[in-house]
């Protein structure tokens, strides 16, 4: 089956990218460095050519790993990283001041062992800094050749339009899956209007949209799903009837549930490039092959109906996490 590459700014990439956060944090302890390096190289061997990291992942260790493991293969893939969510003395901080963005970029370039970062995102909105000021710094980095493309993450359509007015935005990254469809409120339309590639993270619903999703009681102590209501009880169990319907469809189609979930994001918009993450070589192969799963319009419509936003139980984020993003919410979420 011939796979059509997808547009990412002036580049074209394989329809499924690789999110690298899992190798250092999010769902458990960091991976063994040698095993993580082997996984990254296997990804490139397989044909992945869009890798996503961030300053905050592993407090810089994720970028360092990629820089070391793929130093001699930089021409084979598009490298994305992120600023604004930073670390200092082992603690997270948010800083989108122009001078902070430029300093963070220099540090990322050093860790990644690169002269230029292909795609550089603002990881979160900073309520203390106008987006126009931050974008001015990002535009400067493009002019200086430090970055090639500018991206935004976890921001709404309003901030996207303001940012794009300062400098073209190549990509918008936000959580998007059958479980979390908030980008459909406004961001996907704004991306389409402005010619911005949409990059869904967690397209497998943080592991829930799988053949055998881990139960909350089995989460590792460091698993961030422990504090996200939708992935804890009672909501984990309450959403199982939706999952079972999708699992039946996947079984009928001869694909895994995770492949169906990724294929759904690909079918929703030709400008979507999902970036599922994994520490497993098997899941790496499965996710890559999801680009070969073709959904008919009626299958997409069926999944849309099963996972209607109002049918999915539990908030995506707790109040603190929700306050850190600028993504739109459905009216029923605001009154819950």
Which positions does each model-derived feature cover?
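N-terminal binding-site loop/beta-alpha segment at the start of enzyme catalytic domains
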Residues: 1-77, 330, 334-336
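N-terminal small/glycine-rich loop or linker at the start of catalytic domains
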Residues: 9-27, 80-93, 116, 121
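Short, well-ordered coil/turn segments that N-cap beta-strands
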Residues: 11-16, 47-49, 73-77, 114-118, ...
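Conserved, mostly hydrophobic/aromatic
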Residues: 18, 36, 51, 66, ...
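Active-site beta-loop-alpha junctions enriched in small/polar residues
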Residues: 21-23, 54-56, 82-86, 122-125, ...
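Glycine/proline-rich, positively charged
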Residues: 88-182, 186, 196-197
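Aromatic-lined glycan-binding groove of carbohydrate-active enzymes
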Residues: 183-221, 256
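Terminal-tail/helix-coil boundary detector
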Residues: 193, 221-248, 252, 267, ...
């Amino acid at each position: 089956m011939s796979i059509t590459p997808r547009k990412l700014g002036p580049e074209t990439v394989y329809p499924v990218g690789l999110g690298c956060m899992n190798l250092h944090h999010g769902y458990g302890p960091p991976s063994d460095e040698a095993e993580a390096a082997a996984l990254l190289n296997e990804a490139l061997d397989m044909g992945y050519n869009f890798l996503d990291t961030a300053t905050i992942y592993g407090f810089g260790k994720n970028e360092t790993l990629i820089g070391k493991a793929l130093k001699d293969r930089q021409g084979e893939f598009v490298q994305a990283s992120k600023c604004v969510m930073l670390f200092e003395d082992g603690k997270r901080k948010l800083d989108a001041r122009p001078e902070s963005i430029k300093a963070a970029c220099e540090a990322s370039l050093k860790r990644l062992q690169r002269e230029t970062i292909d795609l550089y995102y603002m990881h979160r909105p900073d309520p203390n800094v106008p987006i126009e000021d931050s974008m001015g710094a990002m535009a400067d980095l493009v002019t200086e050749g430090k970055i090639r493309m500018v991206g935004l993450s976890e921001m709404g359509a309003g901030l996207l339009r303001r940012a794009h007015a300062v400098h073209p935005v190549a990509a918008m990254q936000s959580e998007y899956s059958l479980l979390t469809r908030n980008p459909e409120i406004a961001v996907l339309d704004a991306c389409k209007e402005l010619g911005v590639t949409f990059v869904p993270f967690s397209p497998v619903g943080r592991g829930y949209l799988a053949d055998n999703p881990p139960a909350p009681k089995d989460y590792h102590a460091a698993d961030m799903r422990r504090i996200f209501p939708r992935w804890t009880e009672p909501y984990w169990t309450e959403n199982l009837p939706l999952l079972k319907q999708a699992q039946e469809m996947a079984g009928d189609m001869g694909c895994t549930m995770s492949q169906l979930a990724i294929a759904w994001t690909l079918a929703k918009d030709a400008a979507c490039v999902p970036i599922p993450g994994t520490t497993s070589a098997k899941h790496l192969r499965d996710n890559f092959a999801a680009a070969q799963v073709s959904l008919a319009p009626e299958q997409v419509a069926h999944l849309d109906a099963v996972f209607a936003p109002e049918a999915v139980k539990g908030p995506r984020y707790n109040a603190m996490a929700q306050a850190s993003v600028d993504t739109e919410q459905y009216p029923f979420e605001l009154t819950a």
